[in-house]
């Protein structure tokens, strides 16, 4: 079985799949390396034969995690690295090594699934969009604060904004004008995300008309689903690209 890891800015998304058919044995999201080791070890009858990682962490942090995995499960992790081109997609950055690996792998996965032009909208700690033309040319993209960053900045820099996660969840039962601070903040942030998504859709239509596929991924993808109803929601899109970048027997 293969352990796949997406090490983001705030959390580690993980899953264990069967090597032969990619059937998912287990998975989840954790907030530390130790929590990851415990979660994987808790899977009954799982014997890992390989591990592949995409990480936006520092090289030192990623190496430390690889060492922990080797010690705990006796497998050597393969880490995805930037490339100028791969699987029919050409990296569109002037300095290809500066394109975030999560964005690069999501673009690979989306182009593979779409078989043509595609727009990837990834909503996590940051909100990201990337455009890939029908010939595989990555045209670039956009990055702005995602829901967690917007919320955090308002809480940090505005003294009277204080509320808990349960209140935040209740506030999103609708998007009508907020009648409390928590409703105003949460709904305002969602509307900003939806506006971001709609703008990307307009850009894609200006480029390709209707001849493209939209992909939504990331933990906050459900918040913009109604803004882009034609989108394909693929929570594990980065893992699709990771399997292409780091094939394992």
UniProtKB/Swiss-Prot annotation:
InterPro entries: ATPase_NBD (IPR043129), Type_III_PanK (IPR004619). The keyword Transferase applies. Its main location: cytoplasm. ATP binds at residues 6-13, 125. One of its GO terms (cellular component) is cytoplasm. A monovalent cation. Ammonium or potassium. HAMAP family: Pantothen_kinase_3. Catalyzes the phosphorylation of pantothenate (Pan), the first step in CoA biosynthesis. Belongs to the type III pantothenate kinase family. Its cofactor is NH4(+); K(+). Its EC number is 2.7.1.33. It comes from Pseudomonas putida (strain GB-1). GO terms for biological process: coenzyme A biosynthetic process. Homodimer. K(+) binds at residue 122. GO terms for molecular function: ATP binding; metal ion binding; pantothenate kinase activity. It is an enzyme of class 2 (transferase). Keywords: ATP-binding, Coenzyme A biosynthesis, Cytoplasm, Kinase, Metal-binding, Nucleotide-binding, Potassium, Transferase. This is Type III pantothenate kinase. Substrate binds at residues 93, 100-103, 181. It comes from the Bacteria. It is found in: Cytoplasm.
